[in-house]
């Protein structure tokens, strides 16, 4: 059986926050604002995986109204979902994700993100693709107000 899921997330950039994308700390003057650590890439991936198994969305499992998830490490949230996926007999076929950000430039960190995500999903790094793009200074990402991410995942059983 093959299942496909897609995920999307966006977070606002804010001062006095660490910038964590794809499980990697990125030096920058701002970080992403959110209930958890606001890792926009891991949130999109988690949402894609949840969608692939037909179990709703990330907010169902980790509501932003629950203080248990305040400042939560998004890698731990992804691992929790991935344990459920593996227990159901699925494994990663492949994952393709895009980070949309004007600043900071993500390209120098993409390989580290790819390796970290593969580790979290018990997969080979060849099964994970992460890329970064801009919106050519258009929209909220172009104005450097936030960062968005898209993810598509294929699971196999």
Swiss-Prot record:
Binding positions (4-CDP-2-C-methyl-D-erythritol 2-phosphate): 9-11, 35-36, 57-59, 62-66, 101-107, 133-136, 140, 143
Annotated GO MF terms: 2-C-methyl-D-erythritol 2,4-cyclodiphosphate synthase activity; metal ion binding
Enzyme type, top EC level: lyase
Catalytic activity: 4-CDP-2-C-methyl-D-erythritol 2-phosphate = 2-C-methyl-D-erythritol 2,4-cyclic diphosphate + CMP
Record site feature (Transition state stabilizer), residues: 35, 134
Classification via SUPFAM superfamilies: IpsF-like
Binding site for a divalent metal cation: 9, 11, 43
Entry keywords, A to Z: Isoprene biosynthesis, Lyase, Metal-binding
UniProt EC number: 4.6.1.12
GO annotation, biological process: isopentenyl diphosphate biosynthetic process, methylerythritol 4-phosphate pathway; terpenoid biosynthetic process
Pathway in which the depicted protein is active: Isoprenoid biosynthesis; isopentenyl diphosphate biosynthesis via DXP pathway; isopentenyl diphosphate from 1-deoxy-D-xylulose 5-phosphate: step 4/6
Entry note: cofactor: Binds 1 divalent metal cation per subunit.
InterPro entries documented for this protein: MECDP_synthase, MECDP_synthase_CS, MECDP_synthase_sf
Domain of life, source organism: Bacteria
Cofactors, names only: a divalent metal cation
NCBIfam families on file: ispF (TIGR00151)
PANTHER family: 2-C-METHYL-D-ERYTHRITOL 2,4-CYCLODIPHOSPHATE SYNTHASE, CHLOROPLASTIC
Description of how the protein assembles with itself and partners: Homotrimer.
Family statement drawn from the similarity comment of this UniProt entry: Belongs to the IspF family.
Role this protein plays: Involved in the biosynthesis of isopentenyl diphosphate (IPP) and dimethylallyl diphosphate (DMAPP), two major building blocks of isoprenoid compounds. Catalyzes the conversion of 4-diphosphocytidyl-2-C-methyl-D-erythritol 2-phosphate (CDP-ME2P) to 2-C-methyl-D-erythritol 2,4-cyclodiphosphate (ME-CPP) with a corresponding release of cytidine 5-monophosphate (CMP).
Protein name: 2-C-methyl-D-erythritol 2,4-cyclodiphosphate synthase
């Amino acid at each position: 059986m093959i299942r496909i899921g897609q995920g999307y997330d966006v977070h606002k950039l804010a001062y006095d926050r660490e910038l964590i994308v794809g499980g990697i700390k990125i030096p920058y003057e701002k970080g992403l604002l959110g209930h958890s650590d606001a890792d926009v890439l891991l949130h999109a991936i988690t949402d894609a995986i949840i969608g692939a198994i037909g179990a709703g969305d990330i907010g169902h499992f980790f509501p932003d109204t629950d203080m248990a998830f305040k400042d939560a490490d998004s890698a731990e949230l992804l691992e929790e979902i991935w344990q459920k996926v593996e227990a159901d007999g699925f494994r990663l076929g492949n994952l393709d994700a895009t980070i949309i950000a004007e600043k900071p430039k993500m390209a120098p960190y993409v390989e580290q993100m790819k390796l970290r995500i593969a580790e979290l999903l018990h997969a080979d790094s060849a099964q994970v693709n992460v890329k970064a793009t801009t919106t050519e200074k258009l929209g909220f990402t172009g104005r450097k107000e936030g960062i968005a991410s898209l993810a598509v995942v294929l699971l196999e059983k």
